[in-house]
Structure formats: C-alpha cells, structure tokens
Amino acid sequence: MTQFASPVLHSLLDTDAYKLHMQQAVFHHYYDVHVAAEFRCRGDDLLGIYADAIREQVQAMQHLRLQDDEYQWLSALPFFKADYLNWLRKFRFNPEQVTVSNDNGKLDIRLSGPWREVILWEVPLLAVISEMVHRYRSPQADVAQALDTLESKLVDFSALTAGLDMSRFHLMDFGTRRRFSREVQETIVKRLQQESWFVGTSNYDLARRLSLTPMGTQAHEWFQAHQQISPDLANSQRAALAAWLEEYPDQLGIALTDCITMDAFLRDFGVEFASRYQGLRHDSGDPVEWGEKAIAHYEKLGIDPQSKTLVFSDNLDLRKAVELYRHFSSRVQLSFGIGTRLTCDIPQVKPLNIVIKLVECNGKPVAKLSDSPSKTICHDKAFVRALRKAFDLPHIKKAS
C-alpha cells in the first residue's frame, strides 16, 4: 500500500494544544520519566492491513520540526517558557520509539521512551491512522461532502436554537485525532469561524494559521503517570492536580475528572483545588449526572458555580450540546468540544473509534478507570484492584 505515500502531516503543531501544555510540564517536572503507550481500536475494524502504510508515515514524521514563524507565535502565548520552547525547536520525532505491526489483521502499535518525547506521538499518529484508512476505504469522499453535511447540521442547529439566548454557548473544535483528513478539518473550522459561538480549536497549527484561540489543558495520561510518580497511590490524583498548578498557577485551569471516576475525583478536589482551577471537563459517563455532581460539589464548598466553567467533550454533536446548554446554562459557564461529529461527518464514511493510551510509567502499570467501563484500559489486574482499593471504588467491569 504505497499509492498514498505522501506525508499526511506538514507541521509539528498539527496536534492538540494539551499535548504541548503537558509536554512543557513534563519537561520541567519529570524530565527523566519513561512511559509506554498502546493503540486501541474500540470498534471491530481490522486495521492491520494498513500497518505498512502507517509505518511509512511514522518514518516521515522524523522530518517535522518547529519552524521559525511557529516558534515566534508560541513565544507570544502567555504560558510557554523560553527554556521549553528552545528545547522544542530541537525536538524531532524518533521513529525507533514506535513499533507498528499487523497481528492477524489487528493493528498493533506500541510507543515507548522518555515521556517528554513520547507524549507528542499520540495525536498526530491517530490523525495519520484515521486519514490513511479513509484514503483507502473512502476514496470517493471529499471536502465538499463534509461541508454540505455541516451546512445541513447548521440549518437544523439554527432551528433548534431559535428563540434561545445563545450568548453563553461556546463551541470548540476537538477534531484532530479522528478527522477524515487535514483538509476536511481546516475547511470545517473555517466555516465554523463564521459563527459567533465558535471560540477556538484544540489544533495548534489551525489556531496559528487561522488566528483562533488554542484550547486545551491536560489529558488522562497526566493523571495516569502520577499513579507511579507519586509514592502514595491514594494521593496520586492530588499530586497530579498540585503539579499542574505548579506549572500553570493562573491559567490552563480546566481539570479532567474521569481518570479514576468522577466520584473519586471529587473526593480529591477540595476547596483549594476547586477555587484555583477554573473548571472541569467531562469525558465519560452520563453528562447531566456529571454536571449536577460538579455544581453540587462547588455549592457544598461555598463556591459560586457561575464563576466556574464546565467543558463537555464526550461523543458530542451539535444537538447534544444544545440539550446540555438548555439544562445547565443558567447555573454555570459552559463550553463544548466536538470532535469526530465535525471533522469526520461524511455520508457513507464510518469514523474510527481509536485511541492511544498510557499503559506503563517507569516500567510499572498505570490505569484509566473512567465513568464509562468500556473505556477502562490496563493490562495488570492486580494493579487495577490496588487502584480501586486506594480510591475506594466499587467494582467496575473491565473492558475486554
């Protein structure tokens, strides 16, 4: 499979903002930590036949580097420090950190190496996999079809929100990792820029070129790694929250809540954390139940929920976002991050449900035990039991 061998990626910044935010924190706090991560396809797609084509793209990624104009743009943002950006200028992807294989039709990918380097592979590699698969599966699909679908959805959206005060509705593009293609994502984002409620993108390359606000804070891996970095497993989530505030004391303050379930998170999210963090992000479980828990938690701590932001980003589309907005908009600030339903929404095209997740830190297991049992990831059953015990969790069925 080499007829589509041209590089998918053209910029080191063609990634999600939180990857650079986390990379800087790792660079400053955990320079010598090593990790391993693995690819998962949550669907029944047999993607192993694309292994050779993906391996070619991985090799091509070693030629990406931070360009001078990109460096200058990042330097003007308020949260990057000079030592990190100077290091990032020298950064190159190392393909030796990635193994790609076809395991009886199943695509196997494993990443390993220093966390400060491995952390940048996930998002662009997923985008590469998604685009390569769609090139082969759906050669007839194009940008025009994606735009037509969006225009139709926007007509429905206008009807759905007629008479509704939309002044507190904020939508972000979170669609890099599972996009149909780079071109489709850019076209969709350019169209959404025309809407007053569209506030930014998680993609740093698009944010720079289209003069948009880059959006993102931290991901599950930040909390997962602390399960082995922290000497006390039961304190690992608090350690992760505290370390983030050391790096970003006054900004990038949206905390992800579902690495070890929302209930366990809230037990760790005391008044100091709740006061200093600007808000919370939902990424699994029932969104209404989650939002009600978040608001009740703030109220219990004596914090006005109106001063905080809830970000919803789990499997959203425009209709779901409006339903959540109607439910919560009078009580708390809101933002909505939509990914696949914007950047891979084309008739006859099946989006991929693919992830790359941390599985080890410093040679020891880490786990994600989210509010959606199907998203649970860990090889080591004994560690999962230890994690549940440390965080006083009820039994959660492990995903197969």
Curated annotation (Swiss-Prot):
Keywords tagged on the record: Ligase, Phosphoprotein, Pyridine nucleotide biosynthesis
One GO process term, biological-process aspect: NAD biosynthetic process via the salvage pathway
UniProt-listed Pfam families: NAPRTase (PF04095), NAPRTase_N (PF17767)
Molecular function as annotated in GO: nicotinate phosphoribosyltransferase activity
A single Gene Ontology CC term: cytosol
Enzyme class: ligase
Entries under SUPFAM superfamilies matching the protein: Nicotinate/Quinolinate PRTase C-terminal domain-like (SSF51690), Nicotinate/Quinolinate PRTase N-terminal domain-like (SSF54675)
E.C. no: 6.3.4.21
Coiled-coil regions listed in the entry: none
Gene3D superfamilies: nicotinate phosphoribosyltransferase (3.20.140.10)
Pathways involved: Cofactor biosynthesis; NAD(+) biosynthesis; nicotinate D-ribonucleotide from nicotinate: step 1/1
PTM comment, free text: Transiently phosphorylated on a His residue during the reaction cycle. Phosphorylation strongly increases the affinity for substrates and increases the rate of nicotinate D-ribonucleotide production. Dephosphorylation regenerates the low-affinity form of the enzyme, leading to product release.
In-chain residues carrying the UniProt-annotated modification Phosphohistidine: H220
Catalytic reactions of this protein: nicotinate + 5-phospho-alpha-D-ribose 1-diphosphate + ATP + H2O = nicotinate beta-D-ribonucleotide + ADP + phosphate + diphosphate
NCBIfam families per record: NAPRTase (TIGR01514), PRK05321.1 (NF003704)
Annotated HAMAP family: NAPRTase (MF_00570)
Family, similarity comment: Belongs to the NAPRTase family.
Function text: Catalyzes the synthesis of beta-nicotinate D-ribonucleotide from nicotinate and 5-phospho-D-ribose 1-phosphate at the expense of ATP.
Full protein name: Nicotinate phosphoribosyltransferase
Organism: Shigella dysenteriae serotype 1 (strain Sd197)
